[in-house]
């Protein structure tokens, strides 16, 4: 199962805000620094960790200060996923899921800047929303995600 997330850049705080697709009017967004992921896997996340954030349908690791175990970037327009992502990101995410050390924070930050910000900077897109697919995680979902149309622009 996967939870679909909207991603919006908050330029005032220089963070990416994540929230479930179709739930823009419910709950509050989950924010985190673009380069805040540590170089190694975080400890196990308790089942109730982050439940107060009202982000239904997300794995519990999504609420970890270290970020989710696996974050698969997908753009509905160019269909870029971890399958064809540069710098062996799928292997990195798989290692992180297994609790092994991964690439440096700088490497992860560079990847997201390349993928997430390239269209905005080079193509001049004003709508700074992208869609993320969060899945492939060893943690259980908090609850089943609400059905939504992946290709509906947020």
Swiss-Prot record:
Q: How is it modified after translation?
A: A fraction may be phosphorylated in insect cells and HepG2 cells, a human hepatoblastoma cell line. Phosphorylated in vitro by host protein kinase C or mitogen-activated protein kinase. N-acetylated in insect cells.
What are the alphabetically sorted keywords of the record?
Activation of host NF-kappa-B by virus, Activator, Apoptosis, Host cytoplasm, Host G2/M cell cycle arrest by virus, Host mitochondrion, Host nucleus, Host-virus interaction, Modulation of host cell cycle by virus, Transcription, Transcription regulation
Family assignment from sequence similarity: Belongs to the orthohepadnavirus protein X family.
Where does the record say this protein resides?
Host cytoplasm; Host nucleus; Host mitochondrion
The gene that this protein is the product of is: X
The species this protein belongs to is Orangutan hepatitis B virus (isolate Somad) (HBVoru)
| Protein name, UniProt field | Protein X
Q: Which InterPro entries match?
A: Transactivation_prot_X
Q: Name one Pfam family in it.
A: X
């Amino acid at each position: 199962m996967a939870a679909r997330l909207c991603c919006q850049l908050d330029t005032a705080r220089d963070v990416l805000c994540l929230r479930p697709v179709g739930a823009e009017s419910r709950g509050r967004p989950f924010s985190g620094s673009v380069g805040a992921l540590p170089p190694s896997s975080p400890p196990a996340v308790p089942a109730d960790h982050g439940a107060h954030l009202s982000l239904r349908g997300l794995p519990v690791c999504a609420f970890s200060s270290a970020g989710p175990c696996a974050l698969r970037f997908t753009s509905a327009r160019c269909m870029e996923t971890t399958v064809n992502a540069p710098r062996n990101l799928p292997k990195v995410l798989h290692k992180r899921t297994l609790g092994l050390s991964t690439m440096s924070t700088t490497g992860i930050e560079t990847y997201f800047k390349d993928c997430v910000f390239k269209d905005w900077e080079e193509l001049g897109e004003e709508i700074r929303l992208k869609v993320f697919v969060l899945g492939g995680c060893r943690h259980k979902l908090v609850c089943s995600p609400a059905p939504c149309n992946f290709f509906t622009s947020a």
